[in-house]
């Protein structure tokens, strides 16, 4: 009997190991920013922008799969390839841009998580618990797990948090599920009329949904995860299935968040600007249990994205320098410690530094077109890809993604300019 149980556990562990790179990407992608974007879309426009999510997830899968295939064929990560085959400056740009983005994300994510926990604590404690204490708790939790230096332990803990997040948001979907006809109608591309008082046009809301789903950091870190897994072109099917699993779950979770907001706030004619605000709006409509489930999902989303966020910069430095990824080295522990402390900025000062916000917005705007352009260049090189060069159809799809990324870059840079001129 013990032997049988041991075999079952072993098979489960082996099955989990196949999807760990995808789970890492899922945790990285579904954070408080994407939750806010999807919830706002659902609250303001119901499920009419569901097609945007479908298109975003398709683009994300397409890019993840092709970047992963590049690493399977060449054995190189994205930063290695940029440095070696394009120009070292391109690799350095990605290192700086993603590093600044991570710093801004850590501040924002931990600020939102701490605020949500504070709002939640008000329901069972008079005056609640100050956000700083929650931020310190989650920062310490992530850093202690990182300190172990064991990638497998880290990945399994992340898988547990992602599973909790998925369960919470799926439960919310079934609690607030819109009519099936509404879901089907949302798959038909259309732009609804702007909602009075929304503050954002449906086009801007759609662009924010794309921006939080089609994220360059996913594609760059994907190559690192594929190389770390030890996969070669012989495991292309496993790599593709892992990417499909990750993006499929990404769609289900994001659609569930939209549906929760559409089935409550949109029907009631209520609007929101932040994830924490949604808790107060939901309670009179759905009750304390539903709010608690949604809050748990939000917290899990924040924590699951915090893990990859603090690891990303050290991993990218290792990639660019060609060094072994040993996170027990003092220099990497110091980098992660400093990045982790940035999570206290918003709870303490109630705002992110304006310089970080501007730089993060600017880099995010231009990095996606560059990521697509680099892939088109590298994956068409016969000397690198041999018989695995991009097909005509793949080049056409990438060209379409590139054009759309230039459009979102224009919107992003316009937002940066507005921020600068309003100072």
Predicted feature locations:
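Membrane-interface loop-to-helix entry segments
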Residues: 137, 146-178, 361-368, 390-395, ...
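Hydrophobic alpha-helical segments and their helix-loop junctions in multi-pass secondary transporters
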Residues: 163-194, 206-207, 212-224, 374-383, ...
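Transmembrane alpha-helical segments of multi-pass small-molecule transport proteins
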Residues: 121-147, 164-169, 326-345, 368-377
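Extracellular/periplasmic helix-exit of transmembrane alpha-helices
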Residues: 61-73, 226-227, 248-277
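Hydrophobic transmembrane alpha-helices that form the core helical bundles
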Residues: 91-125, 135, 302-321, 352-359, ...
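Transmembrane-helix boundary/entry motifs in multi-pass membrane transporters
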Residues: 8-16, 46, 73-101, 122-123, ...
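Flexible loop linkers connecting adjacent transmembrane helices
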Residues: 2-4, 37-40, 65-90, 117-121, ...
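Juxtamembrane transmembrane-helix boundary signature
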Residues: 25, 52-83, 93-107, 261
